[in-house]
Design a protein with these regions (language model features):
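Short acidic-glycine-tyrosine-enriched beta hairpin
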Residues: 88-112
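Short beta-strand His + acidic residue motifs that chelate non-heme Fe in jelly-roll/DSBH
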Residues: 64-65, 83-85, 106-109, 115-120, ...
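Short glycine/proline-enriched turns and hinge-like loops at secondary-structure junctions
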Residues: 66-68, 75-76, 119-122
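Glycine- and acidic-residue-biased ligand/ion/polar-headgroup-sensing regions
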Residues: 69-89
Length: 145
């Protein structure tokens, strides 16, 4: 498994994510100083969408941010997170707990909406997708503070 970089160096007809991939990614997240590890699921940098697995552990810090050019869809595969929305002043406006064994398992957030997340359970893995090719966040997409 290649947790960083592209899923495969050649075109593939289909991909299956199994328990071993989730376990390996979780193992890497536990030893990562940021307490999270992403796995890029695109075929190449030219792919027109962003698709990734993100394994995380409690204590990981996700800054309050937004995406100008994309909505964001998150599916919880394992564990639990609290997805938090904020207003322009950094005040929490609402939140939802996504739980792989609970009521809410998927969230679609509109573009330009300030948000963050809190990992509530060890071994958590989410699937994220966004529109367009990957671009690092711009300075005005990360809230100071």
């Amino acid at each position: 498994m290649a947790p960083i970089g592209f899923c495969n160096s050649r075109k593939f007809l289909f991909m299956v994510i199994d328990q071993k991939i989730l376990d390996d990614l979780t193992g890497l997240a536990k030893t990562n100083s940021r307490l999270r590890q992403a796995m890029d699921l695109r075929n190449s940098p030219e792919d027109g969408s962003q698709r990734l697995l993100n394994a995380m552990e409690p204590g990981t810090v996700m800054p309050i941010h937004r995406h100008h050019g994309s909505s964001e869809t998150v599916v919880i595969l394992r564990g639990r997170i609290r997805w938090i929305f904020y207003d322009e002043n950094g005040n929490e406006t609402e939140s939802v707990v996504l739980d792989a064994n609970g009521e809410y398992r998927m969230l679609c957030a509109e573009r330009d909406r300030w948000h963050s997340l809190e990992c509530l359970e060890g071994g958590t893995v989410i699937f994220e997708c966004k529109n367009g090719a990957y671009h690092p966040l711009e300075a005005d997409e990360v809230m100071e503070g």
